[in-house]
Amino acid sequence: MEHRLHRTDRRLAEAGSVLEFYKDTMVLPDGQVQIWDYVHHKKGGGACAVPVLDDGRILLIRQYRPAIDRETLELPAGAKDSSGEDPAVTAARELEEETGYRPGRMTKLVHILTAVAWCNESTDIYLAQDLKPVEGQSLDEAEEIEICSFTLDELCRMIYAGTIQDAKTVAGIMAYRSMLAMEEQKEEQKKPDTQNRSDSPKRSDTLLDKMHRLILRARTG
């Protein structure tokens, strides 16, 4: 696809320790010239963990976010130490620092672009399992974090109720739920086929129907 919208100049307006703020000169398809804001994350972003305990409950953290002046419920997450750091390492480190649990197994769930209109930041989200407690939290000076745990159904209801609004947390929880539904579908497909073969076209709707039922259950409680 040919893009008629294009950038002709980028000027650094302000540089911080993590972010750089730029003014981009953009030429629109009709020839107009506009100045757009662009925020560059020096390390490219970070990583996030969906930490699942042995009993199936999921760890979240509650912390105050000055940008929105209120507390939020979030999955453990943080920025990479460098642009080249393996995001799985980032996610495991942040999980241990913020919750005091070390994961024995990490599985990639999704990669998300958090603000494509004006920033290059991305977040890699991992499922963290086989959690082992370590010495405790290792927080930065400015961090005040309360550790909470919820069932998956509770978290889905909280998302639909608007209690959980953090984008990476919504993405991580729903990706985990989708993964479980797909795994259950695969197990069902392994079972001996006792249905008439003429019914086989209906099988393609099974996962979609399953996800629809899960969503309705989460909304209604």
Labelled PLM ranges:
Residues 45-48, 53, 79-167, 215-217:
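Unchanged
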